[in-house]
Amino acid sequence: MQLGLINSAWAQAGRETSWGIRKTKEIGFDTIDIFADPLEIDARERRLIRDECRRQQLPIVSVCCVAVGLIDFNPSVQRFHIERAKAYLDLVYELEAKNLLLVLGEYIWNREVIPPAEQWRTALDNCRRLADHAQSLGLAIALELEPFPLSLLNSVDRMVAFLDEANHPALKANIDVSHLHLAHVGPKEVRKLQGKAIHVHISDCDGKVHGDLPPGRGVVDFLPYLREIKALGIDGAISIELEYSPEPDKVEEWVREAYDATDRLLEEAALRG
């Protein structure tokens, strides 16, 4: 697999888009994932992303989208988020990337007012619609497994059940190693995602709260997970996810530390290449 970086690491530290893309290549990454809202960026920014990545010979693999409104109980909110997610898919196509990383969100009101089964059905219906659009563009959607108690997809079993029920060839899973650890999902559970996973995120945490730290800064035992991921035979990328560097002025060192640590892990797991 290739080693990538989600470019939000740079943006959240106030670095300009093209600078971040150039630095990603300079550090040694094979690929890049883009965190950008197509409803917020203009045509110039879209072209800048595409052209700078081409110039650096840095393929874009994924575009990240958080769309919690897809499972809102208000149809008008759902319609907006469907159209917004379609705009994301169009951006994925425009950037010549492979997939849309999609975060669905959580059950509302502690699962006590709106029946959980209703939100589950809503998610299935709307994800199928989006998967149809993705398939028409030759793309795929990678659903994020979130580690929070009320997250719709917060375990491998829930992810597998959702994908099986959706039964759509363009709807797949993303594996986030830190999220698996936080959700108390063991490495062997990853085997259930054979043929269902197309993308991977990697970061560390303290074992208690969501952290997105450079590997080695927390408590995650990565190698057992990486060996199971290798066995899946995914033709894709493992992207480092770093959020909110504690010292924004030293974000380059933060990213280099994450790159070096992850590169060593992938080499030990015989996974990069």
Segments from the language model and where they lie:
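Glycine-rich, proline-tolerant flexible connector loops at the mouths of alpha/beta enzymes
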Residues: 33-54, 107-114, 210
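Conserved beta-strand positions in the central sheet of alpha/beta enzyme cores
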Residues: 33, 62, 101, 142, ...
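Active-site acidic/histidine proton-transfer and metal-coordination neighborhood
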Residues: 11, 16, 55, 71-172, ...
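Short active-site-adjacent helix-start/loop capping segments
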Residues: 41-43, 69-73, 248
